Amino acid sequence: MSTAVSGNGNDPKPTALQDHQQPAPTTGTGKSTAAGAGADAAKNERGKGKTVAFFLAFAALIAVLLIPIPGLDYTGQIALAMLAFAVIMWVSEAVSYPVSAVMIVGLIAIMLTFAEDPDTGKAIGASKGLSIAMSGFSSSAVALVAAALALATAMQATGLHRRLALYVLKFAGEKVSHIVIGAIAISIILAFFVPSATARAGAVVPILLGMVAAFGLPTESRLSALLIITATQAVSIWNVGIKTAAAQNLVAVGFIEDQMGKSVSWGQWLLWAAPWSILMSIALYFVMRWAIKPETESITGGRELVEKQLAEMGPMTGAEKRLTAIAVALLAFWATEDILHPISSATITIVAVAIMLTPKIGVMDWKYAQEHINWGTLIVFAAGISLGKFLLDTGAATWLSEKTFGAIGLSSMPIIAAIALVSLFNILIHLGFASATSLASALIPVFIALASTLDVPNGGLGFVIIQQFVICFGFLLPVSAPQNMLAYGTGAFTSKQFLRTGIPLTIIGYLLILLLAATYWHWIGLV
């Protein structure tokens, strides 16, 4: 019987992507030295820019605190100041996201300690201030994210997601058109079982690069660009389709539960979002075939390479079989939430993780999980929820919504017009964010406040959900999403190639949002 994976010899190999990276060709020592000097200069410039942004964030914080804001008490002003600080930190990446998250929590706690409680007229105090700053850490959504990260780590520990990807590509064959469809299909299948966009991209990208290399083409070939961008964009598309596919969805669900008093089951999300993702997947195929013309329409030896890699993996291990059983059972429980049973997605996922960590019947031990789970993501997630709740509870989100959207008379517009304008704003502001989780933390509270002013069904639930779908748009630039950057790091495509596919995908995605809002989502009562 196969033993559970431990941290001693069966670690997933994070260098799989690096195996396909090739150094830039040089024609002489002089050019190589010049390139190195240029890279150092660019690095220094970025460092200076981050330093400026770091101090600018604190300057913005102080400025918002000092400027009188009519209609907002001082705690609301602190919330607004923290939002300004967070946005500058997140957009500039002056410090890493986890570091900025810790700073946000600490600053909220310190400022509230000395701030006056608008209800009592006394200082809020250290205990209550810290409780408000840490409120996001007690959200059930944080527990779900932690469990989802553990599930993604288990997939990497066993290599099950890679085996699944290889099986799909084996059936895709050697025609490029079929492999493109296969890359999309892999992203769809993995979205159901791997709750991490980066992990899904990390499973597929090395395999596709290996197929290109087997044909004798370099990493920077058009064929590489076609396949890698297809897989990456498909990951972003299905971040929308599946509730558990991306952390930013769980941010939105957490705010909806806490502030709107409504729960969104896994099945409900699928019913609402899957039609958009299915239509976008079809559009993705045609956009990619139009945007990038590969050097060849057939990869000779591609199937043999996939079969060889499957043979090297050997038969399914006991850990893989157990993880398959756990993942299928988990999916079944997710899909039947509030239909066959009342158990929440978070509870089910935590139980599944407990089973995965149990000796003999599990698939990994705690030491392995501790070393490989991205705990920074969890801290960013919880801090983002704390900030969002702070904005909503103090009325700062409502004030910001009124000032941002009230001036254009959004509340008096037809719902389709409101969705069109806010979605466009959402897409444009995403250009400044590399993390959709941070973007959701900043915008969803504002959208919840805005939804309360609109004449829409379900108290504006559908409006907020649709804006969360748009937050998942990461099609335009490599820096728009972590999975994009992972793929971009292989050197398989340029920013220009990515943008060439991203512009039509963003336009189509936006138009589909409006089409479904006017038809399908209206028919089922979402909007």
Language-model region placement:
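Flexible hinge motifs at transmembrane-helix junctions and intramembrane kinks/re-entrant loops
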Residues: 70-75, 85-103, 286-293, 316-321, ...
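Structural signature of hydrophobic alpha-helical transmembrane segments
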Residues: 53, 71-81, 138-150, 200-204, ...
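Short, amphipathic, aromatic/basic-enriched membrane-interface segments that mark the entry/exit
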Residues: 44-50, 66-76, 168-176, 217-221, ...
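Helical membrane-embedded segments and adjacent short helical loop/helix-boundary regions
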Residues: 47-57, 74-79, 92-101, 131-149, ...
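Transmembrane alpha-helix interface/packing and boundary motifs in multi-pass membrane proteins
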Residues: 88-96, 186-196, 232-243, 335-338, ...
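Juxtamembrane and boundary regions of transmembrane helices in multi-pass small-molecule transporters
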Residues: 2-3, 20, 30-34, 38-67, ...
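Lipid-exposed faces of alpha-helical membrane segments in multi-pass integral membrane proteins
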Residues: 52, 56-63, 81-88, 103, ...
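Membrane-embedded alpha-helical segments and adjacent helix-loop junctions characteristic
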Residues: 99, 103-218, 376-377, 381-454
